[in-house]
Amino acid sequence: MITHQPEWLHTFIRDADRRRRRRRRDDEFVAVWVRQTRDVAFEAEDALDDFLHRAGRRGRAARSRPGCALGWWPGRCAGEVALRHDLSGRIRQISKRLEQISDNRATFNIERTPTPAWAFSCCSSATTLAAWDDLEEYTVGLDKDIDKLKEKLLDDAVTARAVVPISGESSIGKTTLARKVYQSLEVRSHFEIRTWTALPHKCRAADVLRDIHRQMNNQLRRAASRQVPEDACDGAAANTRWPSGKDVSNQLYKSMTGRRYLVVVDGSITVTDWNSLRASLPDEGNGSRVLLITDSAGLEAVGHDGPMYKQIEPARLSQEHTYEVFRRRVFGRGDCPGRYRSRYYQDVFRITRGLPLSIVVLAGVLRSKEMPAEWDEVMAQLAPAREPHKKGGGGGGGGGSSSSSSNGRRIMSLAFDDLPHHLKSCFLYLAAMRESTPVDAARLVRLWVAEGFVRPRRGSTMEEVGQGYLKELISRCMVQLVDKGEFGAVMYVAVHDRVHAFAQDEAQEASFVDSHDSTDVVAPATVRRLAVLSSTTDRYVQLSNALPKLRSIICDLAEGRNRGVQYSDLGFLHASKFLRVIDIKGLELKKLPNEIGSMIHIRYLGLQCGDLEKLPSTIGNLVNLQSLILGGRHAMEVTAAFWRIPTLRHVVAPLALPSGALLGDLHSLQTLHGVHPRGWHGGGGNPLARAANLRSLELSELTADHAGALEAALESLDLLVHLDLRGDSLPASVFTVPSLRRLQSLMLWGAVDAPEGPGGAEDAQYIRPNLTRLSMWNTMVKQSFVDMLAVLPNLADLALMADAYDGDRLAFREAGFRKLQKLKLGLQKLEEWTVGAKSMPGLATMMLCRCARMRMLPEALAGMKELEEVVLYSMPDMVGRIEEGEGQDHHKVKHVPVIQTIYC
């Protein structure tokens, strides 16, 4: 009864809120009714959480008094009775308030507002999810602008660094246009370095420079043979001390010198910030470009003495192009039935007025609706937005920008109304993220799970269900897909600035989340979720008052500055005993306070703070913890009690992993990254026997002494999909252990114990049927080992780096690597590389890194018709061999659209 009360009240709120949204926005009676009902629901939630908190505290006190069970038991029973009595009294008071609210509804004649039929039609699993990844950024109507932009970026007549501006009203398609050109083969081939920076609200020049510097380093690191592989442990960004102030400006200038670069800046920029950016980018007359996507204010800021092309201004879509974008979003390769086509397409054009964002959001609603009844109801809902087409209104639907903004707002409101309730919460949560900036999908889903937004579904993990939620939001065009992995998972998403502003307004009105862009936070004591997204010079958080009702805090501060400031101790959270989510990035933090152990409701603890070096012993008291995500430069210790928390799902932290005897029942654990084994020496059975549901495992500091325990562990991990092993001695049996049949991604960093190939290697194609991605560093394998890799049936991405191969002659066998699409070789000792006939028939990208001794390219490259990109990193002799004219290897790669050379 007690646990069902908050759920029933939240259902009551959903009904009340739906009625409010169906009425006029100025209906104060309904607004008061919804607000009071929500307050009652919050009170019920507080009462239940307080009961659980006090009961948990009493339980810990009882366990800390050994040897006095008989004397302690009567008092404990009396205490529990008192707790339950207190909770029952609070629930009775809440029920009385609810009755008063219901009476007021009758008094003021707040009647039920019928819900339209279309609001119940949500076929997420069938229509929307099936097409979530078929939503490419269509550039219908932008062909002329694309050609203009390419011409300006690739213009050999202007060798000086030049600015290419794109401007226009919000949601007109500026970013879509720029990204299409940015990703084109011609641009990728022309520029050695390409960076893209989206400017969040109140961003500073140092943030822009730091982001450009980081992207440039990442591009060079992906090509170079470094001591750290490109896919470093989660939280690697937090481990890096990025320069600040003048240091980052000087380092960026130095690193960019000698390179032709394209720097894209997406957002409004001030004069001061533009001057800082311009001074940090060298102008060497090599045709470098700065592509600026901005508004009129941003254009005024960039006026300078250097070359600047005439701005490109995308127009609204014409009626014909509006039809085409809408058709593709709703019907894919099909089309609207002929008898409805003219009618609905005219409606869509009048409602959206040719604005691409409005078109795709409306399409996201209608793609799951039945035609014609539900379509008619949706169109009727937007009927007030219709106005006669005005002549001279531009390429699109005419009307002023304010009218278009109002129409776009109405469409977003309707799309939000159409979301199922659980997706409403997931969408509003995006108000706590930065706008127009990539958001890690795995982190977002883990936060949703911790908040309780994700509903369990038989046969699927909570994370898989959460990924489904995210895909549905993408399909509905409420969220933008930035990147997806090779295994079908969403990797990064973003939210358009207008959609983000809408989400923040809705979240604020519903008391869902309180967002601040300053570290000096003035928030009401009743706030339940707090987001601090600051780009100021401060790396602390100052609260004006205690927040006893706080459930979640998301803090994203700028990194890499003010290293001399006083460290935080999270004292501002001591009064927030109901916290469920702590997600903090950039805070100056060395250790967690002992008081963290009393916050027993915490489910997600994420601290991306590079100086973090100590965890308190009380962290083992967090009996509801699901995710521990730590990014730091220091290895940390945790008590054995931590490893016995049964709710653990994701541990990404530099921790020591004890022997299996000290591990509890970790049946929920799916992710274990960054840990190093301790107590695994000399066998001792299977150390991960109680974590058999692991999907992703990353271990470091492995030695030969760990071999027995590691192999025993791998034999029990039937569900493992990703494996990353690093150390002095790695077992080659990872290719032959039958239990790892689901393994898709494998990274090995260190010498393998059987360089010729493990026993049973002849069956590798059957034992590793799903292995898609393989990266090997310093493994020192022999030719026979490579021959084994060649028969893997689904290997699509292969990297052999930094002494991964032991020898100066490497051969890819005939008809081997049938599914390989991406190859990366960084073998400094390699002199001769031969490729057999019909080998790598689908190869699309080849990267050669510092293979300075390689005498020539394989002749077989000339016949690889799918090859789209060749990258040569620090290989000047090979660059000469592929030059047109006298290059002896030019004929082997002359058919490749993109050939990129990078020097270090």
Segments (PLM) and residue ranges:
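Extended, amphipathic alpha-helical segments that serve as helical scaffolds
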Residues: 1-62
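Non-catalytic, charged helical/coil tracts that couple and regulate nucleotide-powered enzyme cores
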Residues: 10-25, 212, 217-242, 286-290, ...
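Surface-exposed helical/coil interface segments that assemble multiprotein signaling complexes
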Residues: 47, 51-63, 79, 86, ...
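Regulatory and partner-binding modules of innate immune sensors/adaptors
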Residues: 68-170, 176-182, 207-210, 290-291, ...
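N-terminal flanking helix/linker immediately upstream of nucleotide/cofactor-binding cores
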Residues: 97-172, 176-185, 189, 200, ...
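A conserved switch/coupling segment of P-loop NTPase cores
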Residues: 183-190, 242-317, 396
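A short hydrophobic beta-strand->loop->alpha-helix junction that borders the nucleotide-binding pocket
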Residues: 194-203
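Cross-kingdom leucine-rich repeat
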Residues: 253-256, 261-262, 284-285, 518-528, ...
